[in-house]
Swiss-Prot record:
Family membership: Belongs to the pyruvate, phosphate/water dikinase regulatory protein family. PDRP subfamily.
Reaction catalyzed: N(tele)-phospho-L-histidyl/L-threonyl-[pyruvate, phosphate dikinase] + ADP = N(tele)-phospho-L-histidyl/O-phospho-L-threonyl-[pyruvate, phosphate dikinase] + AMP + H(+); N(tele)-phospho-L-histidyl/O-phospho-L-threonyl-[pyruvate, phosphate dikinase] + phosphate + H(+) = N(tele)-phospho-L-histidyl/L-threonyl-[pyruvate, phosphate dikinase] + diphosphate
UniProt cross-references to Pfam families, sorted A to Z: Kinase-PPPase (PF03618)
Enzyme class name: transferase
Organism classification: Bacteria, Pseudomonadati, Thermodesulfobacteriota, Desulfuromonadia, Geobacterales
Top-level taxon: Bacteria
UniProt organism field: Geotalea daltonii (strain DSM 22248 / JCM 15807 / FRC-32)
Protein name as catalogued: Putative pyruvate, phosphate dikinase regulatory protein
Its job: Bifunctional serine/threonine kinase and phosphorylase involved in the regulation of the pyruvate, phosphate dikinase (PPDK) by catalyzing its phosphorylation/dephosphorylation.
EC number: 2.7.11.32, 2.7.4.27
Positions bound to ADP: G147, V148, S149, R150, T151, S152, K153, T154
Gene Ontology MF annotations: ADP binding; ATP binding; phosphotransferase activity, phosphate group as acceptor; protein serine/threonine kinase activity
Keyword entries, A-Z: Kinase, Nucleotide-binding, Serine/threonine-protein kinase, Transferase
């Protein structure tokens, strides 16, 4: 059996993936990988090298600190261990190509992965909370959007979710009381969406035509739309601590930016 030691100043996932990818090119080999992670001092490196020297094997390492990388290489030689640097040559070449120096901060890839999984978790939550689904989970949302149909609740929710926010949206339907769970949410997390009546009529009419349905029904009737918006306003007035955003003629990006600005600054217009 051959032993391979994986030395890293972070989690060791990067060096292990590279080595495992290379090993797939070799069939029927008996290899054992030993991961030595978070080696950020000379003492850490020396202890790990002493451990590796007990059952010698080749060392592959990814240390972004040049001094530590050189120390590892020298100390490995003293112990008659072969050590191969997987990242320093790449960093030097990229620095030359890009014209800037690397940050040399351990664990950045792991941090990026953590941010990615946070966004995916937010997206998963948001999909499950779309259009008033699972109101029992409203209290878990970072942001709760409320408004009548076709005020961009779903597109806004998904846009914010991809920025890492868990978002729920609740439709406000005239004559139907919103779920009681909505009123148990921290008021500062709730955003009411408003829109110009004629603009909403135009959006709904276009929607009906796209679905090949009659655009002359009550769904796109101006008087009916005005009544729905009045219903919204009454609910918003009962909850003055909610943020209210006018989405008329705004892109999803613009509306999302305003929502986040309000949240970050605590401004209430």
């Amino acid at each position: 059996m051959q032993r391979i030691y994986l030395f890293s100043d972070a989690t060791g996932e990067t060096v292990e993936r590279v080595v495992r990818a290379a090993l797939t090119q070799f069939r029927n080999v008996d290899v054992k990988l030993h991961r030595m992670s978070r080696l950020r001092t000379r003492e850490d490196i020396s202890i790990s090298l002493d451990e590796a020297a007990k059952q010698p094997g080749v060392i592959f390492y990814t240390l972004v600190d040049n001094e530590l990388a050189q120390y590892l290489y020298n100390e490995a030689n003293l112990r008659q261990l072969e050590a191969i640097d997987l990242i320093t040559p790449l960093l030097y070449r990229l620095a030359s190509l890009l014209g800037i120096q690397p940050q040399k901060e351990p664990g950045l890839l792991y941090q990026l992965n953590s941010e990615y999984y946070k966004r995916m978790e937010a997206v998963d939550f948001t999909v499950k909370q779309d259009d008033g689904q699972e109101p029992r989970n409203l209290h878990k949302a970072d942001i709760v959007l409320v408004g009548v149909s076709r005020t961009s609740k779903t597109p806004l929710s998904m846009y914010l979710a991809h920025k890492g926010y868990k978002v729920a949206n609740v439709p406000l339907v005239m004559g139907i009381e919103p779920p009681s769970e909505l009123y148990q949410v921290d008021n500062s997390r709730v955003v009411g969406l408003m829109i110009d009546a004629q603009r909403l009529v135009d959006i709904r009419t276009a929607r009906l035509r796209n679905m090949r349905q009659n655009p002359r029904g009550s769904y796109a009737d101006y008087q009916r739309v005005e009544e729905e918006l009045d219903f919204c306003r009454r609910i918003y007035r009962k909850h003055p601590q909610w943020q209210v955003i006018d989405v008329t003629n705004k892109s999803v990006e613009e509306s999302a930016a305003e929502i986040l600005r309000r949240f970050e600054t605590g401004i209430k217009d």
